[in-house]
């Protein structure tokens, strides 16, 4: 079943086409890689899907029939499409647990039924319980009382994903989740992404680390100059001449076949 469909979406800034007639069909339960050279339109695509930007033209459908292009980002998030950002948005003066609890509170505020279904105290207890579960799930349990500002970069990125999970995503948009990480941090995050996916969450991932993309993703869409260049399985993308040409001068992805990410 298609959980997300992007149909003929374009986004212009002045006379510049950041996205040009992009069509994507994301199947429920997949991990989809969105790759391309710098300036290809990857983050703009995420911004359009998540409601940060309205598309200039085209349509986006969620769960088959619900059209979401043009909806407010808070509305889209409340429907279960949650994104992370290249620069993790944290409350740096809050603890790890408090960051996740606040995200739970904000999510519950969008759920009117939840507000009326129980007392405020009960909701607070449920939010705290769920926040603790998420913190443990993301491997941050021993750091739950640590200030976010004191965390190493890799743990801050993990906390960013934990905050996203607090909003109960059905579709999770990960914008460069591995950027700036050491090899050890990267391996840890890759394992966490797999764990998140095993919870039944569909994942779209923008990432420049091609080895990790080839290892993690079931299917890959390649953007170049705002257009969808090609789609395919990882092995197909590795050997596609158009993709290799687009990446010349950055990284030769044809050399990545068969390599595994260290765990």
Each predicted region: which residue ranges?
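Glycine-rich phosphate-binding loops of nucleotide-dependent enzymes
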Residues: 1-263
